[in-house]
Amino acid sequence: MDAEYSGNEFPRSEGERDQHQRPGKERKSGEAGWGTGELGQDGRLLSSTLSLSSNRSLGQRQNSPLPFQWRITHSFRWMAQVLASELSLVAFILLLVVAFSKKWLDLSRSLFYQRWPVDVSNRIHTSAHVMSMGLLHFYKSRSCSDLENGKVTFIFSTLMLFPINIWIFELERNVSIPIGWSYFIGWLVLILYFTCAILCYFNHKSFWSLILSHPSGAVSCSSSFGSVEESPRAQTITDTPITQEGVLDPEQKDTHV
């Protein structure tokens, strides 16, 4: 009987040991699972706060606090500035072409209505050739001492009164010389520069007229900027206690258990 009792006692003791050991393991596994649950909750809270902050920043970027009229004016001002810069660049390139061009006059289609001596005809050809070479070559062909006093008159007469000079030259020499394509490109350059000046003038005028006519819009715009800057801070302050409560709740549950 003792042997049977002893033989039966060992299995019972082993079972009891297993029963005593299993609750400890279950507690450990439960604690580990609870810890992972805490981490999962923290990760979800952090991801949710990050997604909310990113959505708010995108909304703030898309929804500008400026009034609609200010935004339209700003877009038109930017387009006018880009257009004026492009036109000025094109005009400068054409101006270089005109300055170094040698086609101010079309000498191949020149006609003489009177027979001149050889020396006079040669002089007419040389003067017409110099005039057809453009402003820079015409300036280089003369000595600087002769043009020091009348430099301004020379430039003005060459650029602005070129057809009048040609017409006087044709009347004096009784000859007809057609004007070349460089002269017309020069007028195109002048028109482009006038267009740039008009765009810049109206751009500046409309901008300041809008600011002077709507002074309250600037105040409301600045106040809206301040509210937009303050709102993310307030939202972050309100979000932080939520995350702290989410972290502290599991510890309170452990104490209650």
Curated annotation (Swiss-Prot):
Bias type Basic and acidic residues, positions: 11-30
GO cellular component, one term: membrane
Keywords for the protein's UniProt record, in alphabetical order: Developmental protein, Differentiation, Membrane, Phosphoprotein, Spermatogenesis, Transmembrane, Transmembrane helix
GO BP annotation list: cell differentiation; spermatogenesis
Region annotation (Disordered) ranges: 1-41
Membrane topology (UniProt): Multi-pass membrane protein
Transmembrane segments: 80-100, 152-172, 179-199
Tissue expression notes: Expressed in testis and sperm; especially localized to sperm tail (at protein level).
Cellular location(s): Membrane
Membrane recorded as keyword: yes
Keyword Transmembrane helix included in the entry's annotation: yes
Positions carrying Phosphoserine: S64
Role description: Component of the outer dense fibers (ODF) of spermatozoa which could be involved in sperm tail structure, sperm movement and general organization of cellular cytoskeleton.
Name of the protein: Outer dense fiber protein 4
Taxonomic source organism: Homo sapiens (Human)
Higher taxonomy: Eukaryota, Metazoa, Chordata, Craniata, Vertebrata
